Amino acid sequence: MKRSKVERQSMLKEKIELTPFVTDEQLAKEFHVSIQTIRLDRMELAIPELRERIKHVATNQWNETVKALPLEEVIGEVIDLELDERAISIMDITPDLVFSRNKIARGHHIFAQANSLAVAVINDELALTAKSNLKFTRQVNEGERVIAKAIVKGKDNRDRTIVEVSSYVENELVFTGEFFMFHSSNEKGEN
């Protein structure tokens, strides 16, 4: 059943308000129209593209800010953050992040997203990775979106904060990392 333009735009606006991280491609499939139609509808409704929506949500929904590094230095777009507890970031695998001959993402980009998220979740001015245990579980390809989720698990016997990061493409695990984080409050005997 084909919807009228007004009806489609109304439903589109509602959908984006409910799920601001939905892509134009996903919307096109859901509404059975072209990606270009979705983009034109968004322009008419003054709805920004995905990257701008992510930045808007990130800056407006946090009560806390990243302390250990500037937000623009976090690899990927941070979409959720609760210092010393959890954080989530997303990273779209673009052509500049892949090997040219096989379109597979370079592993250091997947690691960098996870590592910078582990740093960002620490509630301290200085946070450094002292040690990490990593496992890549499948290759990530150009065009895929990696969602990294960091959870602070506690402290080790050397008073380093342990951060576990799991990265997914859709619901499939592609990377896990356990990061042992040194931070300046370790020196002062705080936290």
Swiss-Prot record:
Q: Which domain of life is it from?
A: Bacteria
Q: Does the keyword NAD apply?
A: no
- Which InterPro entries is this protein grouped with? HotDog_dom_sf, Transcription_factor_FapR, WH-like_DNA-bd_sf
**Biological process (GO), any one:** negative regulation of fatty acid biosynthetic process
Signal peptide, first to last residue: none
Q: What does this protein do?
A: Transcriptional factor involved in regulation of membrane lipid biosynthesis by repressing genes involved in fatty acid and phospholipid metabolism.
Family assignment from sequence similarity: Belongs to the FapR family.
Please identify the protein, giving its name as recorded. Transcription factor FapR
What organism, scientifically named, is this protein from? Oceanobacillus iheyensis (strain DSM 14371 / CIP 107618 / JCM 11309 / KCTC 3954 / HTE831)
* Organism taxonomic ancestry: Bacteria, Bacillati, Bacillota, Bacilli, Bacillales
Question: Gene name?
Answer: fapR
